[in-house]
Amino acid sequence: MPGQISAVAVLFLSLTVILHGYQIREKEFPKARGYLQYTATSAEQITTKPLLQLINQRSHITLASRFKDDYIQMAAETSAIENTAHITMKTVTPVTTKSLPPISSASYTFVRSNNAHMTASSTDDTIGSGSIAHLPVPTTRASLAIVNYITGRATQLGGQTTLPKTFFTASHKSTTNQRPTLSTNVLGTSTPTHKDRSTTSPVPLVPRPTLVTWSSPAKIGTYEVLNGSRLCIKAEMGLALIVQEKDLDSATQRYFNIDPSLTHASGKCDSQKSNLFLNFQGGSVNITFTKEENLYYISEVGAYLTISNTEKTYQGKKNTLMMFETVVGHSFKCVSEQSIQLSAQLQMKTMNIHLQAFDFEGDSFGNVNECLSDYTVVLPMVAIIVVVICVVGLSVYKIRQRHQSSAYQRI
């Protein structure tokens, strides 16, 4: 019996000592116990286990945490009210769009001071399971404050910080053991490299004139010279240059037709003289018009030609001319070929020419004056036709006369 009483007394004494020690530990280390409770609660929440059914219980824990190296300061207030879980983030500029896994009830609020100059407007997003998180772009140093959602007051945190360039992101599909992954977004400007793919097309080489041994009709080109906005020279014609080379035994002629598509027309116009310049690869032609009272004519023609295979140049000028004379305001036309001897070795030939200089009414030719050579060709043809008609008429008349005389004799 005394042994049993001693055992009971020892047990009772042990319980008293344990209880007393527990009370002393409660008084001496409340902060450590609170920190351990918070650590256990936070670890349980981060692993995203099913939320505890907390009924009629409110716990408000205010946490101010800092990242290392003074990167970010943020205010956190955690509250657990029944089964509600939400996160409110105020961001400055949305950069990346990610989905965070289910997180316990915690409210994170970023507050920027008035002296922080940001270009983008703030946006509010509530983050839950499957929602979208917009993360801020760190462009300036902004002060952060702790916001108490119960009292509605904000406590300013001292110091300024620059938001880091590393953010926490998570995939859309979350599991119970999934943890946020680090996604580093390197912000900065980079100059893109553009490859210059523009190519300079080579300038086509126009061959120099090549002479041929046969004559062929030259192409008809239209050449105009303007005096300001008014037309002062207009010419429609075909041109050919003839090279004459004499040997000891014989003389040969070779031909070069001027191509209008490869010829550039220019010139100058005065009240009494006007010039038409025709430039092409390997040569040129210069025609001068002179005006006297109410008449005008071609007074000078010059040309030069460089042959491609021999690199030999032929040139000549005729300045005592009075060709294609016509009335001022009229145009001159000559269908037949006309030849001008410029030098002993160079000759110019015109064909189907129609030109006018000086006074124009609009952009069209005036009344046409034709050259005599055209008349010399036309008049013989007309005479031949008239003679043929007369012969046919006389023949018909004689035949009819014979028929009539034979009819009278029968009667």
UniProtKB/Swiss-Prot annotation:
Residue ranges annotated as Cytoplasmic topological domain: 398-411
Superkingdom as given in the UniProt entry: Eukaryota
Cellular component aspect of the GO annotation: alveolar lamellar body membrane; cell surface; early endosome membrane; lysosomal membrane
Carbohydrate attachment residues: N227
Lumenal side: 22-376
Keyword DNA repair: no
Keywords in alphabetical order: Adaptive immunity, Cytoplasmic vesicle, Disulfide bond, Endosome, Glycoprotein, Immunity, Lysosome, Membrane, Signal, Transmembrane, Transmembrane helix
Annotated spans, Disordered: 172-204
Signal peptide limits: 1-21
Protein location: Cell surface; Lysosome membrane; Cytoplasmic vesicle membrane; Early endosome membrane
GO biological process: adaptive immune response; lipid metabolic process; surfactant homeostasis
A UniProt-annotated Pfam family: Lamp2-like_luminal
Stretches with biased composition (Polar residues): 172-192
Bilayer-spanning residue ranges: 377-397
Disulfide bond residue pairs: C232-C269, C334-C371
Membrane topology: Single-pass type I membrane protein
Record's function text: Lysosomal membrane glycoprotein which plays a role in the unfolded protein response (UPR) that contributes to protein degradation and cell survival during proteasomal dysfunction. Plays a role in the process of fusion of the lysosome with the autophagosome, thereby modulating the autophagic process. Promotes hepatocellular lipogenesis through activation of the PI3K/Akt pathway. May also play a role in dendritic cell function and in adaptive immunity.
Similarity comment: family membership: Belongs to the LAMP family.
Quaternary structure note: Monomer. Interacts with FURIN.
Name of the protein in question: Lysosome-associated membrane glycoprotein 3
UniProt lineage: Eukaryota, Metazoa, Chordata, Craniata, Vertebrata
Gene encoding the protein: Lamp3
